[in-house]
């Protein structure tokens, strides 16, 4: 079963759903996809779809957390709703996992408490983020008093904008989480739990930053070397944390960090979906399979086969986020952007007047010739912006 919802449905997902005739909730977004993509979707009326959701551990995939509102209100499956809530609310998730991370500092505060909280009360370095959040919105790393005051101003300013762009089930501007900064390399993992609660990893992306202060989603990449070195270790960790989480037939997009000593700590679990917008399609462009297809068909990637001949290559996903204090934009030069990369696999422009980014770019880049990645991760993209 699939729920398609705003802000974006990739044509690959729509084509997959049509080819498989997966039950798709009949909503405005799904009807628009059927019309715009010419996809013969198996549109299923709400009552019938809700009946399928009430099965024990239904196999449900959403492309957007905007769909969570429907799950809460109409699925009629209290166990499913509880599992979603325990992941989506980062404070609740931290409390669930606390027995596994007894020395990990976190604290939940309201917007009003945040405004009055002095820097001296913090354990730094730390991270401030919405307790219910998405897409690195409202995430701030804090090391000093100036950063703390700037973060509080930014959060107060942006909370109203989040309410306009996302429902409260996706981004909440009323409660925030303060937690210790997790050291190590950051990864984004698309993983699902099968009917027995066993983890199946469908892709692993390294999340790279331009500096310690950077919290953006600009650059992710996967490779044969990343999969081979992290797959077994990460699956074992996912199986361990599922003890307190209790997930079955459940897809999750997980952000985590692994330090030099091999200690893995979660950043967040994003329920009922894989990487947001069209990001999970990197598995198709890199490895030739749909990540969501593995979940919906209850299959495990044949890594030995798909990794053959892929040595020395990085398969990237770049989020073309707007710079801070972005001037009014008349146009964005996507052609010039693509010319700056040796092999573009796919470009996904977005409505930059509506959203906080210009689109998504997927490339194949030799690991020993990654200058194009080092450049783009530090770029504010103004060289491609045509101002009004």
Features from the language model and the residues they span:
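Conserved metal-phosphate-binding beta-hairpin within the catalytic cores
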Residues: 242-278, 307-314, 318-326
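Conserved ATP-binding module of the ATP-grasp superfamily
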Residues: 103-104, 145-183, 244, 376, ...
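Glycine-rich phosphate-binding loop of ATP-grasp-fold ATP-dependent ligases
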Residues: 126-156, 186-190, 210-226
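Peripheral (often C-terminal) accessory segments that flank ATP-dependent C-N-forming ligase machineries
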Residues: 296-388
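Conserved N-proximal alpha/beta basic substrate-recognition cap immediately N-terminal to
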Residues: 29-122, 134, 365-380
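ATP-dependent carboxylate/phosphate-activation module, predominantly the ATP-grasp catalytic core
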Residues: 180-183, 190-246, 270-299
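N-terminal basic/disordered segments at the start of proteins
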Residues: 2-18
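ATP-grasp fold ATP-binding core
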Residues: 97, 122-142, 161-184, 189
